[in-house]
């Protein structure tokens, strides 16, 4: 089959250093592009578990494209990665893990999912539609201060207070149920002099991250990755905005440096760091950005487990 080629594909394949007989986890299956690349590099005894909390990503028709005895596809969030690995008896044996964080292209392109401010659809934004709270439910009942806090904390939106007030004012007239309605509210609330990109970009990002617990799940997943990897195993994390990357960077720093106070008399050679960063932050090439403009904000960090 001809698989979709995802962002930073070549860099991820190189970063995972795939062994033909290795065990790998793709924590964000999506369209299956990274998983397909891993399978191409595995031998007959290699194994891959692909996870995704979006039921559309792990739908039967998608699984049919990946009929392969070496692959198991699991409908589950990567926040439960350790349990899924443990259920297979792989804990401490995994040679590589990939996390490609954030919303996928199919989710953005499907207006019915409600992720995009450029396509009118129901204001949903749930990556897993079985989840109870959607964006419209929250927007129409949250206190103004809670909306402001979400827009600031998860979107770093400078005009969070103005937008939150505009949302509350608008919903007093009628419930906000469509993506276009929310987008129009944000546009009207935004100072014209500040419009350099679409005014709703940060608002939609913030609400999506909040509704899907994206940062919480990433925070829960990273320590699990460390525990499930074998010594010498690799972790590759692709993020698309500073909030995610900052969280990943801090985790790597925490696990790759000395935590002991300087006054404790232990030699540097006796300190056991758990992770080693491999190279610096990787960004897509200009050629890739030209082919796929969405790749522009992608960032890849690669680490290896030492102990």
Swiss-Prot record:
Its EC number is 2.1.1.199. It is found in: Cytoplasm. One of its GO terms (biological process) is rRNA base methylation. GO terms for cellular component: cytoplasm. It holds the Pfam family Methyltransf_5. InterPro entries: RsmH, SAM-dep_MeTrfase_MraW_recog, SAM-dependent_MTases_sf. One of its GO terms (molecular function) is rRNA (cytosine-N4-)-methyltransferase activity. Keywords: Cytoplasm, Methyltransferase, rRNA processing, S-adenosyl-L-methionine, Transferase. The keyword Acetylation does not apply. Gene3D superfamilies: Putative methyltransferase TM0872, insert domain, Vaccinia Virus protein VP39. S-adenosyl-L-methionine binds at residues 32-34, 52, 78, 100, 107. It comes from the Bacteria. It catalyses: cytidine(1402) in 16S rRNA + S-adenosyl-L-methionine = N(4)-methylcytidine(1402) in 16S rRNA + S-adenosyl-L-homocysteine + H(+). Belongs to the methyltransferase superfamily. RsmH family. PANTHER family: 12S RRNA N4-METHYLCYTIDINE METHYLTRANSFERASE (PTHR11265:SF0), S-ADENOSYL-METHYLTRANSFERASE MRAW (PTHR11265). Specifically methylates the N4 position of cytidine in position 1402 (C1402) of 16S rRNA. This is Ribosomal RNA small subunit methyltransferase H. It comes from Coxiella burnetii (strain CbuG_Q212). The lineage of its organism: Bacteria, Pseudomonadati, Pseudomonadota, Gammaproteobacteria, Legionellales. The gene is rsmH.
């Amino acid at each position: 089959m001809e698989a979709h080629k995802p962002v930073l594909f070549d860099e991820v394949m190189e970063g995972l250093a795939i062994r033909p007989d290795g065990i790998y986890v793709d924590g964000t299956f999506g369209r299956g592009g990274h998983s397909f690349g891993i399978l191409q590099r595995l031998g007959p005894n290699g194994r891959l578990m692909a996870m995704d909390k979006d039921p559309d990503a792990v739908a039967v028709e998608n699984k049919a494209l990946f009929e392969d005895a070496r692959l198991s596809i699991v409908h589950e969030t990567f926040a439960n990665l350790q349990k899924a690995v443990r259920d297979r008896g792989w804990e401490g044996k995994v040679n590589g893990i990939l996390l490609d964080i954030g919303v996928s292209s199919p989710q953005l392109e499907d207006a019915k999912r409600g992720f995009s401010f450029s396509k009118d659809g129901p204001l949903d934004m749930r990556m897993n539609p079985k989840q109870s709270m959607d964006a419209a439910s929250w927007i129409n009942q949250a206190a103004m201060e809670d909306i402001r806090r979400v827009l600031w904390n998860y979107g770093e939106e400078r005009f969070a207070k103005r937008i939150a007030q505009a949302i509350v004012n608008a919903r007093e007239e009628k419930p906000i149920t469509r993506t276009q309605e929310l987008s129009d509210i944000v546009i009207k609330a935004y100072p014209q002099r500040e419009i350099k990109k679409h005014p709703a970009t940060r608002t939609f990002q913030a609400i999506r991250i909040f509704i899907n617990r994206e940062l919480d799940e990433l925070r829960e997943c990273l320590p699990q990755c460390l525990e499930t990897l074998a010594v010498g195993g690799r972790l590759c994390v692709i993020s698309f905005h500073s909030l995610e990357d900052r969280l990943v960077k801090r985790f790597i720093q925490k696990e790759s440096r000395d935590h002991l106070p300087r006054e404790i008399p232990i030699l540097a050679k006796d300190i056991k760091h758990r992770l080693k960063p491999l190279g610096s932050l990787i960004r897509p090439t200009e050629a890739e950005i030209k082919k796929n403009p969405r790749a522009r904000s992608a960032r890849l960090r690669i680490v290896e487990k030492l102990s």
